[in-house]
């Protein structure tokens, strides 16, 4: 049986997403143009970027070799459970279970360009 189709995310609120970013991602990631990598890579321009391509960041083999393009739809699945989506990733984040919070964070990430 094919997997059940995923429900599309509700519309996201970038202002709420910024708060989520600051509370859950900023300890490991930056989102500023030209910003330094931290424990995780700089997320400026993440939406529609190929995984494993931020210069100067040492990615896990799983991430570097994944071939993933970070579309909003892919980010939705990844952010729900990073380790399930990409076994072997270095990202230790447990994930965001609430669809609205993922939608808000993705709306914020879409503005980082």
Curated annotation (Swiss-Prot):
PROSITE patterns, per database record: CYTC
Which InterPro entries does the entry link to? Answer: Cyt_c-like_dom (IPR009056), Cyt_c-like_dom_sf (IPR036909), Cyt_c_1A/1B (IPR002327)
Residues the record lists as binding heme c = 28-29, 91
Enumerate the subcellular locations listed in this protein's record, separating them with semicolons: Mitochondrion intermembrane space
A GO cellular component term found in this entry reads: mitochondrial intermembrane space
Q: PTM per UniProt?
A: Binds 1 heme c group covalently per subunit.
SUPFAM superfamilies listed in its UniProt record: Cytochrome c (SSF46626)
The yes or no answer to whether the keyword NADP is present is no
Going by the UniProt record, its keywords in alphabetical order are: Electron transport, Heme, Iron, Metal-binding, Methylation, Mitochondrion, Respiratory chain, Transport
The UniProt GO MF terms for this protein read: electron transfer activity; heme binding; metal ion binding
Positions where N,N-dimethylproline occurs in the chain: 2
Q: Locate the N6,N6,N6-trimethyllysine modifications and list their residues.
A: 4, 83
What's a Pfam family this protein contains? Cytochrom_C
Described function: Electron carrier protein. The oxidized form of the cytochrome c heme group can accept an electron from the heme group of the cytochrome c1 subunit of cytochrome reductase. Cytochrome c then transfers this electron to the cytochrome oxidase complex, the final protein carrier in the mitochondrial electron-transport chain.
The entry's family comment says: Belongs to the cytochrome c family.
Name of the protein in question? Cytochrome c
Upper lineage ranks? Eukaryota, Discoba, Euglenozoa, Kinetoplastea, Metakinetoplastina
